[in-house]
Amino acid sequence: MASKQLSREELDEKAKQGETVVPGGTGGHSLEAQEHLAEGRSKGGQTRKEQLGHEGYQEIGHKGGEARKEQLGHEGYQEMGHKGGEARKEQLGHEGYQEMGHKGGEARKEQLGHEGYKEMGRKGGLSTMEKSGGERAEEEGIEIDESKFTNK
């Protein structure tokens, strides 16, 4: 196989060694087992989402994220996010990952409207490796209207 994609046999071997090779398949001891676990978890999530409604389901996810953040501490939580981003980048490839970021930016622009997006860009442009944009704006007396950051 000339592509970077692993064959089913190679993935099955990795799964048998304890590696998760299917997103959502954690705990499965073969490729097939991981596929079944992932499918079941996905269906279970959909059912729960239907029961709770969109807002309720989002709230449950938010609470779970907060609990995980508390368990791991700030650095651990950041590291987990970084690893997740790297894994997603690997899945999508460079162009796909850039496209995802572009779509996210466009969606955010739509949510905030032109003025809010522009104001957020001003703040982001002030940030450095040492200080956030908010800290720099405060130090330099630059007015940032964060009320514009709310969704339309």
From Swiss-Prot:
Expression sites by tissue: In seeds only. Specifically located to vascular bundles in the cotyledon and axis of the dry seed. Also found in the epiderm and outer layers of the cortex in the embryo axis.
PROSITE patterns: SMALL_HYDR_PLANT_SEED
Region feature Disordered, mapped onto this chain: 1-63, 116-152
Repeat positions for Sequence: 44-63, 64-83, 84-103, 104-123
BP GO terms, sorted: response to abscisic acid
Domain of life (superkingdom): Eukaryota
Conditions for induction: By abscisic acid (ABA).
Keyword Repeat tagged: yes
Pfam families the record matches: LEA_5
Sequence segments annotated as region (4 X 20 AA tandem repeats): 44-123
Keyword Repeat carried by entry: yes
GO cellular component, one term: cytosol
Keywords on record: Repeat
Signal peptide start-end: none
Alphabetical list of PANTHER family matching this protein: EM-LIKE PROTEIN GEA1
Family: Belongs to the small hydrophilic plant seed protein family.
Function according to Swiss-Prot or TrEMBL: It is thought to provide protection for the cytoplasm during the desiccation stage of embryo development.
Protein name: Em-like protein GEA1
The organism of origin for this protein: Arabidopsis thaliana
